[in-house]
Each structure stands twice: as C-alpha cells, then as structure tokens.
C-alpha cells in the first residue's frame, strides 16, 4: 500500500484509529446476522473485507454489492490476504480457515472482540438480556436516529426503518446487541448497559449452573466505568435479585411501582401498543408504539430510559416509537392473503424460548382475539428442547392449532426424547389440543392447505429455517391450491 493510500484510509478510519496496520479482515461465517453487521460497519470504514459461508443469502449478496469478497465453502486459501480472522463460537476450531490462520500466525479473534474494538472509541450502548435484545437495540437506534444523533449500530436482526442490521454513523454513539450465549459480551466496555431480563438459556456455556450465568451478567455490568449507567428491568425477578450486587449507577424500569422509569396504563389495539411512561422529574410520556405486546412496551421503556439520560427531546422519542417498523422476524406481519378459502394473516417470529413463544401468543391474542391462532413451531436445538421440555409443552398448548416441525439442530447431535415428535406426543397427551407433526419443512405446505380456514392467524415460530418457510408461504400468498400441488 502506498503512502498516499495509507493517508486516504486514515481519513476514513475514524472508529478504530489504532488499527492502521490492519488491511484485510476476514469473517468465517460472514452470512450470520451478528457477523455481517460488524463486517458492514468495517467495510464502510474502508477496510478490505472478505468472508466465507456455506451458501449465498441476502446478507452475503448485500455485502458483495458493497465491495466485500465472499467465498462459499471453507478452505485455507480464503485467509491468504487476511490481517485478522474473525469467528463466531458456532465455527468449529478444526475449520480449515482457522487452522490456516493459526499456522500462519494470523490473529484469530471472536466476533465480540471486534465489536469491542468498534466500541472502544465510542459512547457504547450495549443491550443484553435473555430476551428482547434485538428489538430493544432497534428501538434505541430508532430514537437516536429520529433525534438526529446518527448512531452507529450493530444489531442481531434487521432494523426495518434502516433496512439493514448495521450502519456506520457519524456521531460518537454506538448501539449494539450484546450476546450472552457464549459469554462473549464480557469483551465489551460500554458506557451504558441495558439488561432486559435473565433466564436459563445457553446453559452449556455456563456449565449448567444458573449461578454462573447470573454472575456473568454482574461481571458484564461491572465492565461499565464507575461513571457509566446500568439500565435494568426491575420486573424481572432475577434482575431484581441482582440489583444489590451491582456497584454502578442503576436506573430501573418496568411496570413495578418502584421503577425509576415506570410503564402504566398499557393496552393493545391490533398491532399498536398504548401506554404512559412516568419519569422522575420529567413530563410523563403518552406513547403509541407501532408493535404489539407488553414485552415490547418494556423494550421501548428501556430505550426511553437511555434516551432520557442523554436528554433526547421528548418529541423525537414519541415520533420514533409511533413510526417504528419493528425488527426482522419479531412479530413480523408478512401480509393478509386471500387463500381460496377466505382470508388469513401470516406472521413470522424468531422467538425460540418458551418465554418468547408465550409473549408472542399473548400479543397475538390481545391484538386479534377473533382469529383462530395456528402456530407452525420449529424447536431450536436438541439441548434447549431437552432442558426446557415441560416449559415448551405448557406454552405451546395455548394455541388453537399446533403444527410441529422437527428440531432445527444448529449442528447439535440428536438427543433421545428431545425432538419434535416427542414434544408433539406429550402435548397431545394433555388433551387440550391435537397437534400435527410434520417432519420436514418441504412437507408442510400441503398439510397447511388442509388446515387453513377463513380468518386464521398463521404464526411461523422459531429461530431455524422456519423463517424461510414463512417467506415461501408469503410468496405463495397462502394460496391453498398452490400449497396442495407441493404435496
């Protein structure tokens, strides 16, 4: 690289000025939501970005169009130009690209380490918690953007208003989803940390010990400087339990009477949520939030608490929430279609933990009480299905019709008795509903064609490839005749 080229890049690379020796950053598994977001921000910083994945998707297409070099399949030659290799915990250490990088003394770092470098020179706002991270990150981003603060953001899902899951902004603010699934959020050193809730999930990371998980969240909060800010949902019993152990300034939020930022008078009409937020020494805010569910009202209140501390104008908060389009695959309304047997509404949701499924069902019931709720559920990971088996059974029999797919393994080995067929059998045995087991996504459309009725709300639910199924059903407009032909 010439001296002139180095000077040009120095002008562009404002986020991590000390990374001047880094030219090419390679991402193993670049098509994932978390990886692609960081890659896109660094691409906009002027770095040469390369990455590999097993197959093309909308993310890899977008990155390629922006100038990234994309490889399909994993091989040692992919890292020849790399100054550093970024990996997620989903990538096996025996991956040939990781092996080649280590043999050639190319640094191999985790995704969160690179995110931490992006955050190091910025006012970082990290959003953590078992549930609600993606939506809360999107809501906070929307408010800051509406206020003209032009934040950089890196989210685990699509921010619909922005049309992307990551963007390089011009201000000092960086808003990012903080992932506890592999404890890698401990690399982050933000100025503000949100904790939405804490439940048992990803327990393999924590040796099956919930106390270890709780301590990890405390350690995450103590990564804040002494002048930093923790924003914590006091409605969550585990978060409330941990409050006395947090030695940083804390703002609490929730429906609880003792919350510093309190949500009251909640009601839902269709997809919109209406509620009032009370803040100490500030005017109450009467909110219209353009997404359904009490859980999303809580997510919005977290974002309001953060924005209020930054003295964001109330008008910007109100406008941002009214115009919020949601996050990708979070109660994502794909349309209402004439099926050939009346009209039906199609909604897609990423929730894959019993608590997430439960609040999604409640939001659907509250907004569309007159509709029959038909859920197509795909369990995610055998270990999660095993660990939360009874909780899944308790939640899933609250729909009117349940179509159960088999487990999306996410690379795990099958566990006896922790699959879709077994879960289906357990729910049937309770006598409340009679679920239908469909072993593959390919076999589902003709089954659905025989189930769908006038006025149904069809809800595809899960973190696996059931999201692709939702898009397929939308492309067919839920047409019964088309779906039958796929049988």
Swiss-Prot record:
Residue numbers binding ATP: 129-135
Major enzyme class: ligase
Pathway note: Cell wall biogenesis; peptidoglycan biosynthesis
Compartments where found: Cytoplasm
Main location: cytoplasm
Keywords: ATP-binding, Cell cycle, Cell division, Cell shape, Cell wall biogenesis/degradation, Cytoplasm, Ligase, Nucleotide-binding, Peptidoglycan synthesis
Record-level GO BP terms: cell division; cell wall organization; peptidoglycan biosynthetic process; regulation of cell shape
GO MF annotation list: ATP binding; UDP-N-acetylmuramate-L-alanine ligase activity
InterPro entries, A to Z: Mur-like_cat_sf, Mur_ligase_C, Mur_ligase_C_dom_sf, Mur_ligase_cen, Mur_ligase_N, MurCDEF_pg_biosynth, UDP-N-AcMur_Ala_ligase_MurC
Enzyme Commission (EC) number: 6.3.2.8
Reactions it catalyzes: UDP-N-acetyl-alpha-D-muramate + L-alanine + ATP = UDP-N-acetyl-alpha-D-muramoyl-L-alanine + ADP + phosphate + H(+)
One GO CC term on file: cytoplasm
Task of the protein: Cell wall formation.
Protein family according to the UniProt entry: Belongs to the MurCDEF family.
Annotated PANTHER family: UDP-N-ACETYLMURAMATE--L-ALANINE LIGASE, UDP-N-ACETYLMURAMATE--L-ALANINE LIGASE-RELATED
HAMAP family the record matches: MurC
Annotated protein name in UniProt: UDP-N-acetylmuramate--L-alanine ligase
């Amino acid at each position: 690289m010439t001296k002139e080229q180095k000077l040009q890049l120095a002008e562009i690379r404002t986020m991590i000025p000390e990374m001047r020796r880094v030219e090419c950053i390679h991402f193993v598994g670049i098509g994932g939501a978390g990886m692609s977001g960081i890659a896109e921000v660094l691409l906009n910083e002027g770095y040469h970005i390369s990455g590999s994945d097993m197959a093309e998707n909308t993310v890899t297409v977008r990155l390629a169009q922006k100038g990234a070099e994309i490889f399909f399949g994993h091989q040692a030659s992919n890292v020849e130009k790399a100054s550093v290799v970024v990996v997620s915990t989903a990538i096996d250490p025996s991956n040939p690209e990781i092996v080649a990088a280590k043999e050639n003394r190319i640094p191999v770092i985790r995704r969160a380490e690179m995110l931490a470098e992006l955050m190091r020179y910025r006012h970082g706002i990290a959003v953590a918690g078992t549930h609600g991270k993606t939506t809360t990150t999107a809501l906070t981003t929307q408010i800051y953007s509406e206020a003209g603060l032009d934040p950089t953001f890196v989210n685990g899902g699509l921010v619909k208003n922005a049309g992307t899951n990551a963007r390089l902004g011009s201000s000092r603010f960086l808003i990012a989803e903080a992932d506890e699934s592999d404890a890698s959020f401990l690399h982050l050193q933000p100025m503000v940390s949100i904790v939405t809730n804490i439940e048992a999930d990803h327990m393999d990371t924590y040796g099956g010990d919930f106390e270890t998980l709780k301590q990890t969240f405390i350690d995450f909060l103590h990564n804040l400087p002494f002048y930093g800010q923790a924003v914590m949902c006091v409605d969550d019993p585990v978060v409330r339990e941990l409050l006395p152990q947090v030695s940083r300034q804390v703002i609490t939020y929730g429906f609880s009477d003792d919350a510093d930022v309190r949500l009251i008078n909640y009601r839902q009409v269709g997809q919109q949520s209406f509620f009032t937020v009370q803040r100490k020494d500030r005017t109450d805010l009467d909110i219209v939030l353009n997404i359904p569910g009490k859980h999303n009202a809580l997510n919005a209140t977290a974002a309001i608490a953060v924005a209020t501390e930054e003295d964001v104008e109330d008008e910007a908060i109100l406008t941002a929430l009214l115009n919020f389009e949601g996050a990708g695959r979070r109660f994502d309304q794909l349309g209402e279609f004439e099926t050939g047997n009346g009209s039906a509404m199609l909604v897609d949701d990423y929730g894959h933990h019993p608590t997430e499924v439960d609040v999604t069902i409640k939001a659907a019931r509250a907004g569309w009480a007159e509709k029959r709720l038909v859920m197509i559920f795909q369990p995610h990971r055998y270990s999660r299905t095993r660990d939360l088996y009874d909780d899944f059974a308790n939640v899933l029999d609250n729909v009117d019709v349940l179509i159960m797919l088999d487990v999306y393994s996410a690379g795990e080995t099958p566990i006896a008795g922790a699959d879709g067929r077994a879960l289906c059998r357990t729910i049937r045995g309770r006598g409340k509903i009679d679920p239908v087991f469909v072993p593959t996504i390919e076999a589902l459309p003709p089954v659905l064609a025989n189930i769908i009725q006038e006025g149904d709300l069809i809800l595809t639910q899960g973190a696996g490839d059931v999201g692709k199924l939702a898009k397929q059903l939308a492309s067919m407009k839920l047409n019964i005749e088309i779906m039958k032909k796929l049988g």
